[in-house]
């Protein structure tokens, strides 16, 4: 999969073909887009390349999803502000593949509509350069009086999303792919979070709701991997809520779960990547040598 989920300027559109062509020829499975112009351009020049719609396109309902399907999209990542009911409606109405965020950072502003980073830092979140301005401390005044000072609470910083308890609901809403936010995260974080969610998806598929239970050790592991001041279930069950915002000082020191980190490094990060292969060689005097190697999948 390739991410092209950024706004593409007019003068850049013509470079999109040469940018995608080598990846397309190498077997690219799908491309993720935000820009409507990029969507139509890719459908024209790479008609058999599946196109996924990024959350940055702010798909907030079934009507926009219908239009995107008519333009050739096969999968949509809805806006992160949608409820489970609204996500289910998109799937039921369009039959599109639906992919939703299940873990990681949440934006204070609407997905794909935020200008905060551009205005304050000169870096556009819609061009892949978000400075995460909402993570900074801010003063807040009401009727001329401070209700928050910079050194007190992070009033615009949202807690990270965590949906382990909602996996059955999410899968039953027609979601086919779980999206884990990993911007500027380490391989250790990626390995830890993905392996935990894989565990609970498999548990639900095997045992159903009756056998579904989340271990506290896994909740603790997710917080140990990254903690911005707690976790929430985002907008899946609540339209909005005070408990989604950090609203507290960052702790000066966090205990490190070194045992967990060592396990992840040993199991996923610092391992040699190998797969079994079979092969044959043909060598004859006066002729070019020939060697053929393949893996179990026939590659």
Question: Model-found features: residue ranges?
Answer:
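Short active-site-adjacent helix-start/loop capping segments
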Residues: 8-12, 40-41
